[in-house]
Curated annotation (Swiss-Prot):
Gene Ontology molecular-function annotations: AMPylase activity; ATP binding; magnesium ion binding
Family indicated by similarity: Belongs to the SELO family.
Binding site for ATP: G87, G89, R90, K110, D122, G123, R173, R180, D259
PANTHER family from the UniProt entry: PROTEIN ADENYLYLTRANSFERASE SELO, MITOCHONDRIAL (PTHR32057:SF14)
Pfam families: SelO (PF02696)
InterPro entries: SelO
Cofactor(s), names only, from the UniProt record: Mg(2+); Mn(2+)
EC number: 2.7.7.-, 2.7.7.108
Protein name, per record: Protein nucleotidyltransferase YdiU
Organism of derivation: Mycobacterium sp. (strain KMS)
Primary enzyme class: transferase
Key words, A-Z: ATP-binding, Magnesium, Manganese, Metal-binding, Nucleotide-binding, Nucleotidyltransferase, Transferase
Active site feature: D249 (proton acceptor)
């Protein structure tokens, strides 16, 4: 593995947005989990990554010759308030490599130590939050949702002081890039239009090369990002995923999910579901995610206005027209996805829409577990109504809905291909992380195995398909910084 090479394209093309930096030395690095499948796809030798030299690479203490680790600069709106200088406070971009499919991928560290962007933070991360991101990001990938990936989590042997002293860790993350709406906001706030233009060109080359030859490639970039984000948010909604911190610095240009700090999956269906301990007003609630995405994209458009047209009024009109397509793309993706969840892919949309509206009201009024419902409904498509009927208190209302739905000829087998049995249920995640913090990785490994094969029911994993017991109570998440 001595021939591993990492490019420094971002640092080379956008030096104004990259600060060369080194990871802090990990005093006693110990590999906790390694993603063999991802390593293989990246052309990396998993056995070598498990070696002492490989583990040192995974925490950034040994980098290939020619690699240029950098902390990336970005700005962002955080809960609606603008911060002009955020950046990688506890992260480093080690560099880029080309995977087995010919795609350029970032190799990135999280929790690698204090950088010039750290502000008052220590730049470190604890084992629990890094394992959480590994678990949830790999579950999202298995669900078919665009996401950053997790290559490894390594315990550093360094204590991390939070409310108590915790074991430190580094997550090795892989992404199509770490370009964010906040990256463009940082470039724009400098007042350097050429920097914004070069950043846009970099984004086009990496993510949307098809627009490079368009009459207006920068407008094409914006339209492509709007479309990618519409598809992404729809996929979140279809599985009950609540991101929890949809700041503009956490919206990617690639259309991948990033930053799994306070995220969680909705249990009982409720559009007002919020898990994050710092989201006291519910800004990033489950049902608000589409509108927040549109708001973030409007902030992205603002950074690109000088590239759209020299005439500001015309530039604004172009941006508004392009942003207007986000809602149409989102509704189209959500409708198609819901039809698939109901086994009604071949049925005309107008016949399904009122049925779906009625169903969502029934789910909310009856406090029904979102994931369990759709999986049980697949059994009803095959004639076994009792599992899904057993979820409801208002049986008369649900039975009437069930008759209308079955009259449309749902496909139960198709439903099972899109409705998961296993998701990272909150009580199971906490159970696994608590055990891992005590040195027992077995619950984490079992849960990881379940959620990375989410659609196939397997013997011995029944408890991983069940909602949280009532005693688990109301769930709150924390960002882990």
């Amino acid at each position: 593995m001595t021939n591993l090479s990492l490019d420094g394209r971002f640092a080379r093309e956008l030096p104004e947005m990259a600060v060369r930096w080194k990871a802090e030395e990990a005093p006693d690095p110990r590999l906790l989990v390694l993603n063999d499948e991802l390593a293989s796809g990246l052309g990396l030798d998993a056995d070598w990554l498990r070696s002492p030299d490989g583990v040192r690479l995974l925490v950034g203490n040994s980098v290939p010759d020619g690699a240029t680790p950098v902390a990336q600069a970005y700005a962002g709106h955080q809960f609606g308030g603008f911060a002009p200088r955020l950046g990688d406070g506890r992260a480093l971009l080690l560099g880029e490599l080309v995977d087995g499919d010919g795609r350029m991928r970032d190799v990135h560290l999280k929790g690698s130590g204090h950088t010039p962007f750290a502000r008052a933070g220590d730049g470190l991360a604890a084992v629990g939050p890094m394992l959480r991101e590994y678990l949830v990001s790999e579950a999202m990938h298995a669900l078919g949702i665009p996401t950053t990936r997790s290559l490894a989590v390594v315990a550093t042997g360094r204590p991390v002081r939070r409310e108590s002293v915790l074991d430190g860790a580094v997550l090795t993350r892989v992404a199509s890039s770490h370009l964010r709406v906040g990256s463009f906001q940082y470039a724009a706030v400098t007042g350097d239009t050429d920097l914004v233009r070069r950043l846009a060109g970099h984004a086009i080359a990496r993510h949307h090369p098809e627009v490079a030859g368009a009459a207006d490639p920068y407008l094409g970039l914006f339209e492509a990002v709007c479309s990618a984000q519409a598809q992404l948010i729809a996929r979140w909604m279809l599985v009950g995923f609540v991101h929890g911190v949809m700041n503009t610095d956490n919206m990617t240009i690639s259309g991948e999910t990033i930053d799994y700090g306070p995220c969680a999956f909705m249990d009982v269906y409720d559009p007002e579901t919020v898990f994050s301990s710092i989201d006291s007003w519910g800004r990033y609630a489950y049902g608000n995610q589409p509108s927040i995405a549109a708001w973030n994209l409007a902030r992205f458009a603002e950074t690109l206005l000088p590239l759209f047209d020299d005439d500001i009024d015309r530039a604004i009109t172009l941006a508004q027209n392009a942003l207007g397509a986000f809602g149409r793309h989102y509704e189209g993706a959500l409708t198609a996805g819901m039809q698939a969840k109901l086994g009604l892919t071949g049925v005309d949309g107008p016949a399904v829409a009122p049925l779906l509206d009625e169903l969502l009201k029934l789910l909310q009024d009856n406090h029904i577990d979102f994931t369990s419902f759709f999986r049980a409904l697949g059994l009803a498509a095959r004639g076994d109504n009792e599992p899904v009927r057993g979820l409801f208190v208002d049986l008369a209302g649900f039975d009437a809905w069930l008759d209308s739905w079955r009259a449309l000829g749902p496909d139960g087998a198709a439903m099972d291909r899109v409705n998961p049995v296993y998701i990272p249920r909150n009580h199971l995640v906490e159970e696994a992380l608590t055990a891992a913090a005590a040195g027992d990785m077995e619950p984490f490994e079992t849960l990881l195995d379940a959620v990375t094969g989410p659609f196939d029911e397997r013997p011995g994993l029944q408890r991983y398909a069940e909602p949280a017991p009532e005693a688990f109570g109301r769930y709150r998440t924390f960002c882990g910084t």
